[in-house]
Amino acid sequence: MFTGIVEEKGTVRYMQLTGESGVLAVKAKKVLERTKIGDSIAVNGVCLTVTSLQPDGFTADVMAETVRRSSLGSCKAGSQVNLERAMAADGRFGGHIVSGHIDGTGVIRSLIREENAIWVSIGTSPQILHLIVEKGSICIDGISLTVAKVEEEGFQVSVIPHTGEETTLLEKVPGDPVNLENDVIGKYVERLDRKSVV
């Protein structure tokens, strides 16, 4: 489990695709501390299992389902990615419950500065949007954020400068994809509600 509090920005060394799956290598520092082969690291919100460790990075296998559902397949050498280790049992719970199981992607529509915040507008599919609620939690590229507005074809979040500096979100431009994970509690509530109707 993760919390959506990014620990550092890593740099992609390579994304080697073979057919529909691949291997991702990332240069990192902080997330390597106490990390072992077999541990989980969220890369742009996607839970990946560390398959090998280097003094300054790690590699992980990326399944075909992950390539299809997330934006990891478009990573290139030099790309910056958000990194977070799985939460330790004695860790602080700073964001919200994040599984690292991406629901799909969205597209950056605009980034607008307003005083000490930046409004980020994201378009996404109806399947993801119907589980997004105003003032609820959403995980965007591994970042725990609060939904400020829900619109007909997307939603908006307001990002403080600190979050912008510590993550890759404000490096995005309109048209860039982002990984989205809906609040897991909302997903279970929606599932139970559908079953009760049947």
Which residues make up each language-model segment?
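Conserved loop->alpha-helix
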Residues: M1-V198
